[in-house]
Amino acid sequence: MEQRSFFIKTYGCQMNLRDSEIIAQILNNNGYVETSEIGGADLVLLNTCSIRAKAEQKVMSKLGELRRNKKINPRMQICVAGCVAQQEGKQIQAKMPHVDLVIGTQYIYAINELLERSRTEGPITATNLDDKYVIPQFIPETTGKEHEGEFRKFVTIMQGCNNFCTYCVVPYTRGREVSRSIKDIVEEITVLVKSGIKEITLLGQNVNSYAQTNTVTEDDTPATFSDLLRQVAAVEGLKRLRFTTSNPKDLSNDLMQCFKDLDVLCPQFHLPVQAGSNKVLKEMGRKYTVESYLDLVTQLRENCPEIAITTDIIVGFPGETDEEFEETMKMLETVRYHGSFSFKYSDRPGTKANELTNKVDESVKSARLARFQARQDEIGLERNQEYIGTTQEVLIEELRDGEIKGRMGTNHIVHAIGLTNKKPGDFLMAHVTAAGQHSLRGSIVEE
């Protein structure tokens, strides 16, 4: 088998990172070797994101650069994958004729066959979405070295979304919701844990709706995301379990109970609210209210008092008034999030919000975002200061010069000084003595 080299550049979310890992393993299994040198690679694959216009612009700019690389290295194949590929399809090759292959989000498992075809047939676009798509079984390689030095992994449990929020392209770029079987997921995680992985994060566009659209059990009995969590938590050797992301409308009492029942489930919940105004939420198509959201926050904290709640915020949605933005600021003050990801609204082609005419001025959006982020930083610092004087279990990520960098179960980063014989991937206790906006400082507790 002829050996070829490949280079993957990943844009966007954790789903894309996991997809890139899957693509890399498939390529490795078919004789490819990964390289860090993009210019000399036989294959350059851009795994793209279209959640905001800026991400698309970065991809097109990189494709322009690759035109020059391909002139120097005519053997190079260029592949565009991910959400930009799904959204733009043949338009990519019309604008960038040096692109050999455009594959949508349901075609990553066929990457090798499509590359072979493009070498003989010329440019190929594979982006048709199938409503009856089934995610193929995927078990990671386990020769013993694949995960050397790694201790944290993402595992995709479902793909697509059926919510059709008016600002979001995901249902159009990832297709309808489809869930992997519990058996496949547990088998993948078991293999990863046996190879040394300590922490697993389950991924889906809306994990709360896992198993709502297709059967995930061998005997076709109904199942829920909570059922999956309980089975994954039982995998021997798994130390920490997380998941992302969730839609509040599907958050069940049983899922909240899992934070009481499952020791490995980290006390962290990313619960996107997007806006603090019922009018804006309705325009966004979010299907919950401010009141129902706040009730969920209360219940989560009752079930798990130490839980750290984070969120997503969009400012400047079409028609958002000053008064409605103030309601979002009130939401921030009420919940006092440990952290948030906040963005200015960005028009996305094909979405309902894109057709709205009452757009908010860019300068107003910028001012609102700056104000929200400044207050979030203040609250984040105040939240972090609550940990001063406590002793926390930390999973070591880095170790250098008498200091460790690690992460708590709440996902807070901790820098702790002191001597230890432990290495990255091990756990230790750290006494927190100081707090910043985005991390904590402390000292290693001697055993």
From Swiss-Prot:
PROSITE patterns: MTTASE_N (PS51449), MTTASE_RADICAL (PS01278), RADICAL_SAM (PS51918), TRAM (PS50926). It is found in: Cytoplasm. [4Fe-4S] cluster 1 binds at C13, C49, C83. One of its GO terms (molecular function) is N6-isopentenyladenosine methylthiotransferase activity. Gene3D superfamilies: Methylthiotransferase, N-terminal domain, tm_1862 like domain. Residues 4-120 form the MTTase N-terminal domain. HAMAP family: tRNA_metthiotr_MiaB (MF_01864). Belongs to the methylthiotransferase family. MiaB subfamily. Monomer. This is tRNA-2-methylthio-N(6)-dimethylallyladenosine synthase. It comes from Desulfotalea psychrophila (strain LSv54 / DSM 12343). The gene is miaB.
